[in-house]
Amino acid sequence: MSNKKDIAVKNSGGKKIREAREKVKSDTLYNLTNAVERLKSASYVKFDPTLEIVMKLGIDPRHSDQMIRGVVNLPAGTGKTVRVAVICKAERVEEAKSAGADLVGSTSIIDEIKAGKINFDVCIATPDMMAAIGSVARILGPKGLMPNPKLGTVTLDIKNAIKNAKSGQVEYRAEKAGIIHAGLGKLSFSDQDLLQNLNEFIEAVIKAKPAGLKGSYLKAMYLSSTMGASVQIDLTSIA
């Protein structure tokens, strides 16, 4: 049976949620600047939430020419600590370590992956290791961790790849319904930093529009914060 203290805590939490929702109008369209301001004022959680974007695209990813995928280097970073694994031959291990890789090895890392030990957020590989990595493709692929030359994670330039991963590189990929979702920084970032990240990301997705696509490409866009409110963006305000 709940005591008075428990009830007070629950009521307090409910009140914060109601107050937060009142600050964001569900029937209103916002430009990016106003959206960021609203989400900050409506945040009530005790941790530092992530600013998240959802973009609905007028594509059908089932068609190979409409698969939208790429990477964006966010100017202000993501605010997250990224653990990077590098799979390379022995002669390049020290180079990878010096560049800041958290895990470095060849078959040793592949064996750990097979055993279910995946303690990294990004996996970078040199081209000469891709044949061996193929044995764990079914494990890494569904997790979005499979090295890919189009994303810059299969490369001879280990140093630059590690730098990009650590400094705030974000991958985007359209899901089956044409939805792209990504985290673009912490809500504690300055408005300017968040807007820079947003503009960089949105511009990259818009540039990725398939050449032969008919009809509207950008259908809808929403911003939200972790466990917070969601606001819809006025697409006419996007340059």
Curated annotation (Swiss-Prot):
One annotated GO biological process: regulation of translation
PROSITE patterns: RIBOSOMAL_L1
Pfam families per the UniProt record, alphabetical: Ribosomal_L1
InterPro entries in the cross-refs: Ribosom_uL1_bac-type, Ribosomal_uL1, Ribosomal_uL1-like, Ribosomal_uL1/biogenesis, Ribosomal_uL1_3-a/b-sand, Ribosomal_uL1_CS
Keyword set, alphabetical order: Repressor, Ribonucleoprotein, Ribosomal protein, RNA-binding, rRNA-binding, Translation regulation, tRNA-binding
GO cellular component, one term: large ribosomal subunit
Ribonucleoprotein found in the keyword field: yes
GO MF term list: rRNA binding; structural constituent of ribosome; tRNA binding
Family classification: Belongs to the universal ribosomal protein uL1 family.
Quaternary structure and interacting proteins, as annotated: Part of the 50S ribosomal subunit.
Function: Binds directly to 23S rRNA. The L1 stalk is quite mobile in the ribosome, and is involved in E site tRNA release.
Protein name: Large ribosomal subunit protein uL1
Species lineage: Bacteria, Pseudomonadati, Pseudomonadota, Alphaproteobacteria, Rickettsiales
